[in-house]
Amino acid sequence: MGGNFPFPVKYGYTTVGWVEAGPADLEGRVVFALHPHQNIFNVPSSSVVRLPNSLPPSRAVLAANMETALNAVWDGAPGPADRIAIVGAGAVGALVAFLCGRIAGAEVTLVDINPARAEVARKLNVDFASPERAPADCDLVFQASATASGLATALESCGDEATVVDLSWYGKGQIEIPLGAAFHSRRLRLVSSQVGQVAPSRRPRWTRNRRLAAALSLLGDDRLDALIAPAVTFQDLPARLPDILKAKSNILCQLICYA
């Protein structure tokens, strides 16, 4: 981000575009960059990453979210045949569910208060449940709802000595954590996960660039198009944004076209 609220401000940080001028190995290539949204900008060549040839640019905008999801999965260390719940079916939660769903024999359930997210879960080949029907006795739970009620659901879904990985972003807000009841007697673990550093289990060997490259390669599955809404133009955005931001819009990732 650049600038100050309320204005002027350059917002956003995930950009996919074509290199108009630069080193020969990048010129004319489609690249991913962490940069505020705008139609043209100058960055060092080291700040961009070429997309795999098979990856559509529209899906590559999920790269930063996939990095967050991958880091959280490393922090949680799920295994084959584990029962896993993901509370919060936003873009990051859905990507965690997608990654866990590829583990042999794992029982993966995406949990959300919005019943429309069931269709996303279906397209990702994982189960769906409302919070009141969330699975119990889980080996591992990911909390990605950024709500106190979601964290409570995550803890309630744990089996004895299970782990909750919290990858929510609460900002400066404070939430209540239900550490009473059987939290201690059941020896539950609450682990924080944040994409700012590579997960400890990988940090000695993995750089951030290697992690980003892995995230881009993991986006090669076309099932992930279920998370992406059709693009709107930057010119139309002022009129479209109010509807996009409505809680009932069901939009997980809104593409914006600056061309």
PLM segments and residue spans:
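C-terminal hydrophobic helical "lid"/dimerization subdomain
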Residues: W206-A259
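Glycine-rich cofactor phosphate-binding loops and adjacent beta1-alpha1 units
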Residues: E119, L124-V191
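Mid-domain Rossmann-like dinucleotide-binding core that forms the NAD(H)/NADP(H) cofactor-binding site
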Residues: R59-P131
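Local beta-strand N-terminus motif with an aromatic residue
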Residues: A81, D137-D139, L224
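A structural motif shared across PLP-dependent enzymes of the aminotransferase-like
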Residues: F32-S45
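C-terminal substrate-binding/catalytic core of Rossmann-like NAD(P)-dependent dehydrogenases/reductases
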Residues: P178-I228
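Glycine-rich beta-strand-centered segment in the early N-terminal region that forms part
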Residues: M1-H35
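Class I SAM-dependent transferase core
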Residues: V48-V61
